[in-house]
Amino acid sequence: MFSLLLLTSTALVETALGVSPSYNGLGLTPQMGWNNWNTFACNVTEQLLLGTADRISELGLKDVGYNYVILDDCWSGGRSSNGSLVPDLNKFPHGMKYVADHLHDQDLLFGMYSSAGEYTCAGYPGSLGHEEKDAQFFARNEVDYLKYDNCYNKGQFGTPQASYERYKAMSDALNNTGRPIFYSLCNWGQDLTFYWGSAIANSWRMSGDITADFDRPDSRCPCGDDEYDCKYAGYHCSIMNILNKAAPMGQNANPGGWNDLDMLEVGVGNLTDDEEKAHFSMWAMVRSPLIIGADVNHLKPSSFSIYAQSPVIAINQDPRGVPATRVWRRQVSDTDAYGRGEVQFWSGPLENGDQVIAFLNGGNRMRPMNAGLDDIFFDSHPGAPELNSTWAVYDLWANRMEDSVASDILNGNRSSNGLLYNSTQQSYSQGLARNDSRLFGSQIGTIQAGGRLNVTVPAHGVGLYRLRLQ
């Protein structure tokens, strides 16, 4: 345990000195991309990966920032006679280097999957005990990202040290290849990953698997909202369940290492538009990776416009990299069909002195919500200048793309693509530094010194705002 504390302390010292704590120089902002699992599970093929990559480029999503195309489980054909991983040639007839080349030709990055166990979660060969050989396989095929799961781990868990050592073996092996490979742990938050993840990885899952439900309880996700040290993470965890578990963990994330709340369910299942906006907004607020889980070939216009909302993405990609904090949480009487209902207020600092705030309405009706500057700057002492200043308030969803424009883009109208923010020409960091109006939403008013912001938030919805000093 001492070694873990030392590693954590080292990361904190590096942060204090202004040195990136990223163990491999990657992940200075949360990763963005696409993963097949939420929609396609094991139904993966070369055609799916290449077609998705083409579609991401055609729609302008690559330029918005979604640059990783990640192949999940079920790609493997086993191991060769010398123990090397081989792809299933029925699914990937040209091999993995062919896929990587196609993606790289489009300036996209290629992600693959394995598990820190004897088998992957779907029963294919895992990498436990094969870390060096498998890392060489990934590097040889020019993989840029590894999602590393937790199934069939032979009982090598139960303490932070046990899990740390098991995942460190692949971290070391990836580094030994000499190829920069983003390392994404998927150990479901087991053994307090948020304490030690940043020493060996760029992101780490902090809960059981997500499902496309806003706040539905499920016995397969047995740990409650506040059980951040969950002994049995399970799966089918709702959006609110995961968000509430993540609330205390923001203090352990920073550039180079992020809490991963799992893939986005925008465009998956039957979430309402307000639920999809709330889901996307809160993942951005807590600096979770933004990984599309939907079929990009069959996105509805409203979901596409959420994925393309650059003022919200700019919060997620803010170079300061400080996750927002949940300031308060209150239960409400207007519960849904599952007896669930709560409201929350979140706030966090941004690189340029701005502040981002979110009013989250988990209740079953539209409601007024409000917060004062003492809520927004909850750590400030009485008399602090931020409490005695005037702040301009910008609604980060006010300039959302119209469905008609989104439909034009989805139907191949390239001229409409020019309406999307292009982070390949100007990064979010550069755009924020240059006060690019496309990243700030629309001003809706001001908060005077000592004043309050009053908003109306739909059921299962969010009000998301950026505050700028007047």
Curated annotation (Swiss-Prot):
Keyword Transmembrane listed: no
Glycoprotein recorded as keyword: yes
Residue sites binding substrate per the record: D72, D73, K147, R205, Q251
Gene Ontology biological process terms in this record: melibiose catabolic process
Signal peptide segment: 1-18
Disulphide linkage map: C42-C74, C121-C151, C221-C237, C223-C230
Primary localization class, coarse: secreted
Catalytic center residues: D149, D209
Annotated catalysed reactions: Hydrolysis of terminal, non-reducing alpha-D-galactose residues in alpha-D-galactosides, including galactose oligosaccharides, galactomannans and galactolipids
Subcellular location: Secreted
A single MF term (Gene Ontology): alpha-galactosidase activity
Keywords, sorted A to Z: Disulfide bond, Glycoprotein, Glycosidase, Hydrolase, Secreted, Signal
Annotated EC: 3.2.1.22
Glycosylation sites: N43, N82, N175, N270, N388, N413, N422, N435, N454
GO cellular component, one term: extracellular region
Pfam families for this protein: Melibiase_2, Melibiase_C
Subunit structure: Homotetramer.
PANTHER family according to UniProt: ALPHA-GALACTOSIDASE MEL1, ALPHA-GALACTOSIDASE/ALPHA-N-ACETYLGALACTOSAMINIDASE
Family: Belongs to the glycosyl hydrolase 27 family.
The name this protein goes by in its record: Alpha-galactosidase
